[in-house]
Amino acid sequence: MAKQEQAPDRANDVFALTSFLYGGNADYIEELYAKYEDDPNSVDPQWRDFFAKLGDNADDVKKNAEGPSWTRKNWPIAANGELVSALDGNWAEVEKHVTDKLKGKAAKGEAKGAAGTPLTAEEITQAARDSVRAIMMIRAYRMRGHLHANLDPLGLAEKPNDYNELEPENYGFTPADYNRKIFIDNVLGLEYATVPEMLDILKRTYCGAIGVEFMHISDPAEKAWIQERIEGPDKKVAFTPEGKKAILSKLIEAEGFEQFIDVKYKGTKRFGLDGGESLIPALEQIVKRGGQMGLKEVVLGMAHRGRLNVLSQVMGKPHRAIFHEFKGGSYTPDDVEGSGDVKYHLGASSDREFDGNKVHLSLTANPSHLEIVNPVVMGKARAKQDLLVGRTRDDMVPLSERAKVLPLLLHGDAAFAGQGVVAECLGLSGLKGHRVAGTLHFIINNQIGFTTNPAFSRSSPYPSDVAKMIEAPIFHVNGDDPEAVVFAAKVATEFRMTFHKPVVIDMFCYRRFGHNEGDEPSFTQPLMYKAIRAHKTTVQLYGEKLIAEGLVTQDDIDRMKADWRQKLEGEFEAGQSYKPNKADWLDGAWAGLRTADNADEQRRGKTAVPVKTLKEIGKKLVEVPKDFHVHRTIQRFLDNRAKMMETGEGIDWATAESLAFGSLAVEGHPIRLSGQDVERGTFSQRHTVLYDQENQNRYIPLNNLQKGQAIYEAINSMLSEEAVLGYEYGYSLSDPRALVLWEAQFGDFANGAQVVFDQFISSGERKWLRMSGLVCLLPHGFEGQGPEHSSARLERYLQLCAEDNMQVANVTTPANYFHILRRQMKRDFRKPLIMMTPKSLLRHKRAISTLAELSGESSFHRLLWDDAQYNKDEGIKLQKDAKIRRVVLCSGKVYYDLYEEREKRGIDDVYLLRVEQLYPFPAKALINELSRFRHAEMVWCQEEPKNMGAWSFIDPYLEWVLAHIDAKHQRVRYAGRPAAASPATGLMSKHLAQLAAFLEDALG
């Protein structure tokens, strides 16, 4: 009796002492409290006693239980019979659900009390409370079990101090309760289970060699799928004997390859996989399981660590080719030009077959700039998905179709946590114009970043935490348990192929040697490297496990190692005389294209379009469906455009662009235009996507030109430069027949993607034999808008120009813009195009063209003559060539400033010559033009400061040209703004004063 009297107090003490009332259970307790305030007899006596002691205001209690006023009515999703509410801690719902089920079972005689009789009401309440406590404990394991998993192969990681949150005592269970069967409604795949049975499944599932983070996912279907896949008495990590031997074989190959290179090329950098060999069988599993689920192609991106191993053991690159490169040989045939790159940056492609499923693998070439290859891989994958489906209209490609191409990214732990482009790519993952049906991220977490410990390289517990923002499931796994790693890879692949979402594998391993093979890691990590030196390799540990299981003998393992070594020796010998027989860069989608020849030739391509075709396209550009409500201002815009097409006069910049896009689409070239606000255009000039003013439906005239045309996509991108530009570059690598454009909101912001310009666009062809026809539209022009809205920093791109690597242009007429865009697709080679695009010229009365200039025999002009030379109705008539006293050369918008100032002053002996394409520099064409004015003074005029713009780049070229024509003045004089630290002034008065000064200098 005394014991009974003591029970409520003891329960209260337990409640008070434990974290049973921690935040996750608060809602449940508040709802119970509200029930108690309505009717004290409706709750369990122990709870009644507990609440009686609190003495809170009844109205407050009820308000708290109702939750905040802004709570969504339909959230959380109701229980579906499998206790989904337990995922979200909706305990009141759980208790009601369990009680109802138990009552039903008692009524049918399925649930019996201790005496074997049907359950009484009191026993049902007790059983329901047991169930709720058990489910709370299960939820704690799902939420926090990963923190207790055995993840670190070295055993150096500190255990979390979590106040025993996973202990059964925390949930009101004592050892006396351990033998009692508790109703858990199939939550762990069991209807009834004792506490030890639950713990056995929970510890194995959540605290073994795999730690799963998935409770941050809000989609119940995704969460339920993961639980269903890994929880239950029959869900152990299990492999057949053949599967285990296959894993051992791959580990021996991975380890043996690294050891072989270490012996043959002592001290040479290879960035070995030593310590992370489980990666290799895991990648095989991803390809194999993906292939079974419909995967056709994998696009890989990875850093240097383990790259050679992936190339040889996963991609199937011949070992002799790698050994040939190690001894300093080229990776391309002798007749292919290129500056080359180090071994651990090179790409490759191959086909692998598993179980009759053929999967194409391609590894993307990348620079040492960590993680910047990620968006490139995603862009490549997106283009391959589009090609696979054969898109012709702006229809959504189903994600199940996109899922046939998998972007697979391998990361280092420090880089994944540290590089901003990682978060940008995760941000792109769900966007309509950039999604790829989920990227699989594999972190090789060797728990160190060069010499920096994780505590100094990230603020979060795991390197993978950034992926939580997109609710990606995360599988942490111990790299010394190859079976667990392969299992995690399998489940991750299945999740991606099922839900078409990104997924992360975080493999804890170690780096057996230094950052590179010439490095001494003990300087900075003495304790870690002491542990590593004493630690057995993954092959040794797994070999011992299989020997203990009786699957193999030590002799078997020794023989496997010897056979592999013998194979490598044979390949090593073959590598001495190996000759690459062919560069693979013009295969597949690139078949029919070639490398470009002499940079100074015209290389115009046939870019003109018949007037009839242009008028047909123009007619469609201004048509909208009958029931479509266009904005009044847009209707005026369309009416003006219709007038231009009718008269063939006054073609403005945006119309020329739409005609270029439309004519290419009709000829079968898809157009992909991406960037911030590109649908409308930063300056409200483009309007290629129209919105119905009453229902916001979209209409895209460029996708309604004719049957069978190619697609036009305008993608308002996320507010990122680096990832989006990298993505579009990647897209251009996979589809040379698509015109891919990226437009900066203002050219000034393009330097947020400087790495992509430096490492890929300007140098990718020379380093890796990879051509790209990407177009970058960078709004540029000094109009008094201040230092961040004036300059795309033209000088930066010109400084990168050499060896015919890309084109840089600053065109001044809509016709030239039309031709340069079409030229990108109308030649049999591809080069990136960096284009300074106008702002004020978009609506300038002089910056117009005629349809005649887009048709007939017209083409792109690298140099443009003075308008006064040909237009008879201009304000001034120029003197004959011999009487011209000065030639002012310029590029871009400043031409119109000079032209109008000259007209205002009535000057007729100064000739204005525009350089429309700055690189490749049109030297021969300029010799022809300037030969007309041998005796004239030569001036270069620009609106940019002297240390910016084209001056430093063009000065030596102009000097060379003047020497060739034997000009009277052998040096060009500079006219423009003086050198400055900031590109432009923010004061309009100062801007106008500077403009007046350099116009006086150029024309005075």
Curated annotation (Swiss-Prot):
GO terms for cellular component: cytosol; oxoglutarate dehydrogenase complex. It catalyses: N(6)-[(R)-lipoyl]-L-lysyl-[protein] + 2-oxoglutarate + H(+) = N(6)-[(R)-S(8)-succinyldihydrolipoyl]-L-lysyl-[protein] + CO2. The lineage of its organism: Bacteria, Pseudomonadati, Pseudomonadota, Alphaproteobacteria, Hyphomicrobiales. The gene is sucA. Homodimer. Part of the 2-oxoglutarate dehydrogenase (OGDH) complex composed of E1 (2-oxoglutarate dehydrogenase), E2 (dihydrolipoamide succinyltransferase) and E3 (dihydrolipoamide dehydrogenase); the complex contains multiple copies of the three enzymatic components (E1, E2 and E3). Disulfide bonds: none annotated. Signal peptide: none annotated. This is 2-oxoglutarate dehydrogenase E1 component. It is an enzyme of class 1 (oxidoreductase). InterPro entries: 2-oxogl_dehyd_N (IPR032106), 2oxoglutarate_DH_E1 (IPR011603), 2oxoglutarate_DH_E1_bac (IPR023784), DH_E1 (IPR001017), KGD_C_sf (IPR042179), ODO-1/KGD_C (IPR031717), THDP-binding (IPR029061), Transketolase-like_Pyr-bd (IPR005475). CDD domains: TPP_E1_OGDC_like. E1 component of the 2-oxoglutarate dehydrogenase (OGDH) complex which catalyzes the decarboxylation of 2-oxoglutarate, the first step in the conversion of 2-oxoglutarate to succinyl-CoA and CO(2). It comes from Brucella suis biovar 1 (strain 1330). Belongs to the alpha-ketoglutarate dehydrogenase family. Its cofactor is thiamine diphosphate. Keywords: Glycolysis, Oxidoreductase, Thiamine pyrophosphate.
